[in-house]
Regions:
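Short, aromatic-enriched amphipathic alpha-helices that serve as compact interaction elements
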Residues: 1-7
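Alpha-helical hinge/cap motifs
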Residues: 8-10, 112
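A solvent-exposed, acidic/Ser-Thr-rich amphipathic alpha-helical stretch
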Residues: 11-83
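A beta-strand edge to alpha-helix "cap/lid" segment located at domain peripheries
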Residues: 54-133
Length: 133
């Protein structure tokens, strides 16, 4: 659901996959770790702006997620790593690989539902964030 909700610009469903206190980590161009709250209002606004930009400019993303490695699994906790190839199709014409991604996810099961509580994004190459004005 993670890639499908993001790729179809369904922010509400995408955010429903995360706990209310979910943490996201990634690295900037200088290799410094950046930590954010996934459901922080500014973070959600940036995500919405990015989805709107993709949609209005004819950019389609596809997260090709595979090679899931479950490191730990209990009744209420899971820790896994997963490879992703992030593709983009611009103006319905050219398909390109944006970057391979190596995700680190931690999930919690609450009231019978698994939700992401932690997500680390390791990129092999920078995202094309410069596309946005």
């Amino acid at each position: 659901a993670y890639g499908i909700y993001w790729d179809t610009n369904d922010l509400d469903s995408y955010l429903s996959l995360f706990t209310d206190d979910a943490v996201g980590e990634s690295y900037n161009d200088k290799g410094e770790k950046i930590t954010v709250r996934i459901k922080d209002k500014r973070k959600m606004l940036k995500s919405m702006e990015r989805m709107d930009y993709f949609e209005s400019n004819g950019i389609q993303r596809r997260h090709m997620m595979c090679n899931t490695l479950i490191l730990e699994l209990s009744e209420s906790f899971a820790h896994l790593k997963q490879y992703t190839i992030l593709l983009t199709t611009n103006k319905n014409s050219k398909v390109e690989i944006v970057t391979p991604i190596f995700y680190d996810f931690k999930l919690k099961k609450t009231e019978g539902i698994w939700k992401i509580s932690y997500r680390l994004i390791n990129l092999d190459a920078p995202l094309d964030l410069k596309l946005m004005p």
